[in-house]
């Protein structure tokens, strides 16, 4: 193996390790908000006495009826997926950015397109895990009464298969969700980070990067949430058992808009921003500091 190939493999290994670490930390800290967000998105009416109206009320209801572990339903699939997912997220962003560097594009546009490409690639990897995660998150039974992650995955495969009606349903919505989020997330972060001067003070530099990452995650959440709502409806339980109402991404968006209004496409925005705002800052910081440490020590 040539020296250049060894160097590339070493660099990719650092990106995998740093990306996996960033994803694991973000998931463990922010997963309860992801559960609340999904519950908001799959409900179709607030007249149900078991409906979720506010973030605080949702936390209280889940804790009262499902216990503390109710906030961690569906956490195994994202944990299992985080290392490959974040490895794909960060390594493909760097790969696409390097490839686009050979073209006559402005740096700002390069960051946006590389982010879009990384999001689309990431979506293909993560979608089966998302199908399992959403199904577990919307289950209102006590944690000990619901099927295990692997049992539920086998159940989906047995009943619906591996295709676009089974373990890969909602792929188009997932492509939209991740593509748009990463385009805004990476595009805004790298463009603004290069504009705002860095600080020699470690604390101020930490706050600078966290602040930019926070805004990046918030903006990405606002722009991609209609795709997120459509994804939850397609991958979650259908209104009538045995009858598939939500099939394709854009038809699902149109149906939600027609039946529930434009604001329904933004259900779960508050818990999503509460998760991916600070989560976006945490993830980029963990990645950058872990990657810098690995460059010095490995």
Swiss-Prot record:
Transmembrane segments: 16-36, 69-88, 112-132, 166-186, 204-224, 276-296
GO biological process: lipid transport; mitochondrial alpha-ketoglutarate transmembrane transport
Catalyzed reactions per annotation: 2-oxoadipate(in) + 2-oxoglutarate(out) = 2-oxoadipate(out) + 2-oxoglutarate(in); hexanedioate(in) + 2-oxoglutarate(out) = hexanedioate(out) + 2-oxoglutarate(in); L-2-aminoadipate(in) + 2-oxoglutarate(out) = L-2-aminoadipate(out) + 2-oxoglutarate(in); glutarate(in) + 2-oxoglutarate(out) = glutarate(out) + 2-oxoglutarate(in)
Main location: mitochondrion
Keyword Membrane among UniProt keywords: yes
Compartment(s) of residence: Mitochondrion inner membrane
Matching Gene3D superfamilies: Mitochondrial carrier domain
Any one GO molecular function term: antiporter activity
Similarity comment text for this entry: Belongs to the mitochondrial carrier (TC 2.A.29) family.
Name of the protein in its database record: Mitochondrial 2-oxodicarboxylate carrier
């Amino acid at each position: 193996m040539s020296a250049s190939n060894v160097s590339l493999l070493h660099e990719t290994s650092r990106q995998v390790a740093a990306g996996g670490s960033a994803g694991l930390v973000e998931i463990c800290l922010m997963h309860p908000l992801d559960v609340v967000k999904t519950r908001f998105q799959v409900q179709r009416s607030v007249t149900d006495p078991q409906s979720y109206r506010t973030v605080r009320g949702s936390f209280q209801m889940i804790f009262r009826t499902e216990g503390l572990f109710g906030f961690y339903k569906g956490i195994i699939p994202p944990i299992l997926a985080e290392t490959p997912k974040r490895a794909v997220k960060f390594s493909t962003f760097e790969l696409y950015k390097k490839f686009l560097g050979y073209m006559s594009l402005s740096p700002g546009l390069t960051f946006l397109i590389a982010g879009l490409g990384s999001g689309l690639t990431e979506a293909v990897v993560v979608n089966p895990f998302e199908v399992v995660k959403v199904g577990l998150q919307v289950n209102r039974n006590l944690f000990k009464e619901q099927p295990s992650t692997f049992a539920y995955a086998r159940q989906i495969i047995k009943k619906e298969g591996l295709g676009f009606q089974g373990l890969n349903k909602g792929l188009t919505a997932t492509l939209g969700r991740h593509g748009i989020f990463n385009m805004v997330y990476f595009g805004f972060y790298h463009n603004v980070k290069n504009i705002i001067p860095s600080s020699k003070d470690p604390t101020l530099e930490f706050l600078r990067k966290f602040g930019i990452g926070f805004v990046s995650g918030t903006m990405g959440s606002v722009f991609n949430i209609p795709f997120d709502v459509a994804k939850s409806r397609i991958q979650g339980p259908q209104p009538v058992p045995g009858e598939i109402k939500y099939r394709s991404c854009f038809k699902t968006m149109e149906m939600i808009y027609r039946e529930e209004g434009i604001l329904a496409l933004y259900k779960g925005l508050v818990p999503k921003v509460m998760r991916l705002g600070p989560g976006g800052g945490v993830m980029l910081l963990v990645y950058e500091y872990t990657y810098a440490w690995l460059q010095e020590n490995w």
